[in-house]
Amino acid sequence: MKYNGPCADTAGSAGEGLRKKGGTPMRKRNKVVSLLLAGCMAAGLLAGCGSSGEAQVATADNATAASTSTGAADSAAPETAGEVDGQINLRTVSFGNNFDVQDMGWRWMMAECYEGLMRDVADENGDRFEYAGAESMDVSDDGLVYTFHLRKDAKWSDGQPVTAADYEYGWKRLLNPEYGYSYSFYLFNVVGAEEYYNGQGSADEIGIKAVDDYTFEVTLKVADPTFQSKLVATPLYPTRQDVAEAAGDQWGKDWTKCVYNGPFAMTNLVEDNSMTWVKNDQYWDKDNVKLNQVNWYCVAENATAATMFDNGQLDVFDAAGDYIAKYDKEVEAGNMQTMTTEYPGTMVLCYEQSEGGKSGLMKNVNIRKAISYSINREEMVSAVYGRYTAAYGFVSPAITLDGTSYRKQASETMKEEYEQYAGDADKLKALFQKGLDELGITDKPEDITITLLSQGSATENQLEREYLQQSISQNLGVKVELNTVGDYQMFANERDNKNYDIFVGGWFSDYNDPLDFLNVMKTGVYDSYGLYSNSEYDSLIDSLTGENDNAKRLEIYQKLEDLLVAQDCGVAPLYYSDKHYYYQNWVKDFYTSSFGASQELYRATVEK
């Protein structure tokens, strides 16, 4: 999952376990709530219970009716948490406003209204996969053919059965070049998939087919050790062809035209204000879904959310900075609970490398390194966020290979050179000057302006850009101009128009393998990370195709990361993400998982 913005809300863990203490005992999952469209560093997900009223059953008919019920009551703050059993209030900083699962990079939210073949589950022992839309799976001896046997009791919210045809349509839709989905590459190892996407084949030639109503078959070109991990990703969820085609160009835009096959169904939306889900009474496992209603509230500022949390209007707070010390005292007093988890995400500094950026300097590796090495990561995570872990590699410690954290197997090779320059302004200025000389630039550093593109008005956003501005300016003797825009779309426009030199972005993994990080930097996969391109890097990525020996894969991963981060400084790692939750004592079994749906509410309960 990409995130290109000034900062991101991040959460979760992939197999490294979690820490919790205080209050009433709770089972937990470690996971991801990543903000794809809104930049709030520690804002994220807050859960609570409140809001009175009887939950309605979600169907295609009453979903449309509910969409009209927007008034003063919809924009009101939630009632005091804990007043109503069976209802939970969640806080976020943005609604994705995209309801097409094939395009749901912002999985942190709506994914709980849908369900794929498998789901990611996590507890104190780490993450594991379990069957969801599928009951079982067969894999051929050569690892090429996957046969999924679907649940016959799975239904959409309008009562229609979920069939293999829905998976076939959804997966082939993901590959349809007409739509240009960014996650289409997930299926390029399927027979005929990449050819179809590139306009060189037909949909009928793709190795994706519904054998019968409840048997779904996928044929790969070569055996792929990451394929099963991808099955929890939201772009591989099913889509009803009749519903999508009836919606036409409004598919994914108008939520009232959607049907849902997950534990919850959406019944109301007030843009940039509130969203309501109710328990999906057609869900195959509805008897184990304890919540009747989920209320989302859009609260941009951490300070506002903290006040709501203090007042009992919200039940979960993802804290940073001074809030951590404040709420730790409450935990010690037994007034709430806390949980800290890793999350498979890394925030990085991106450079405009295709044309050199507004300054014309970013093509030069020594310029990029000088900028990177001028940033004290340890100080940054402490002073700006009060959490997170300083990063000197691209792949998150939460990613595992053969059951062990990748970071325990691969050194952060950038760190050795970084430490030669860190804190030494004279050395940093000399490195920057070396880059200027290589470019034939005769301007003095004090006459050079570097543009930092950013977005977001929250305190953490402001602190982040000010810290970067000050660090780069003081260490290199250049001017750093802040190009701060009002929303994500404006940010994306500025980025795509290359109206910047640097910006902070990040990658939050969709499946548990280092490849999901490293593949995004291959030429042409994602152009929104500064357009890094290296033919040697691309060849190393290609060499992983068909390689199933994890020892050999690890060796290639190490070469890739060293080339990207240490040698080329294609991106400059800043910090590894985490989640630091505080919970009111009356919320039970609120899970977060590392991959697939970001939050798992289907087992959560609220008890006064």
For each predicted feature, which ranges?
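N-terminal lobe/hinge region of extracytoplasmic solute-binding protein
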Residues: 91-141, 259
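Surface-exposed binding/hinge segments that line
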Residues: 168, 182-242
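Ligand-site clamp/hinge motif
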Residues: 249, 282-328
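Detector for C-terminal structural segments
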Residues: 372-407, 460-470, 493-608
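Gly/Pro-rich hinge or "lid" segments in bacterial periplasmic/extracellular proteins
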Residues: 122-124, 213, 220-289, 293
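Alpha-helical secondary-structure segments
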Residues: 163-170, 213-219, 223, 262-263, ...
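Ligand/substrate-recognition segments at binding pockets and active sites
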Residues: 271, 422-509, 579
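Structural transition elements
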Residues: 389-435, 457-461
